[in-house]
């Protein structure tokens, strides 16, 4: 793992780079940031961009390694429990590696928040399966690193569905808009009550954090100013 690079944002003009570095020098930057949000909202893209911009280590979910995922999207009722447990064990392993990693590593960015894990389980599992999942979850989540900042990306369900269609992932083709609506509602409910860490809620419906440099830079500047409590980033057209 590399140390934090205090000169940070790549692919930006020199004046902005200097300004962001000056802003950052005035604050205590979060040592662990978790980016969250429903399928298609762009959490992995943002996590990767932030990690690259500031030369930080990044922890990413690996859905392509979950052998149950494709079967789950074809038949959620039959394959919900194994797909959920596989993701849980994968996320736990990554966080345990983070805890045991280089003590000098200053910043990590992940595209998941382990506290949110039961959200998917509650949506997809029946009551008996959920009780089994919850028993496993509660036994293995102890003593894990907690983020210093959670960034929750939001978008309307229609926008999420359109983004999924546009990116053309074969595994995701069976995903219905109604399922995305269930997940979106569950995320909204979860983060409405979430207060365990500082939280930045970002409305992504009219911005493009993947390819629009101005949208991305403006969000980075807002992140640099985010300290404690709950914050909302809601850019206007």
Where in this protein do the model-derived segments appear?
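Glycine-rich phosphate-binding loop used to anchor ATP phosphates in small-molecule kinases
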Residues: 79, 83-145
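NTP-dependent small-molecule kinase module
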Residues: 165-174, 181-237
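Extreme N-terminal, non-catalytic leader segments
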Residues: 5-31
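Conserved substrate/cofactor phosphate-moiety recognition/catalytic segment
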Residues: 52-90
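Hydrophobic anchor at the beta1->P-loop junction of P-loop NTPases
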Residues: 35
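A glycine- and Lys/Arg-enriched "phosphate-lid" helix/loop adjacent to the NTP-binding pocket
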Residues: 117-188
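Conserved lysine of the Walker
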Residues: 43
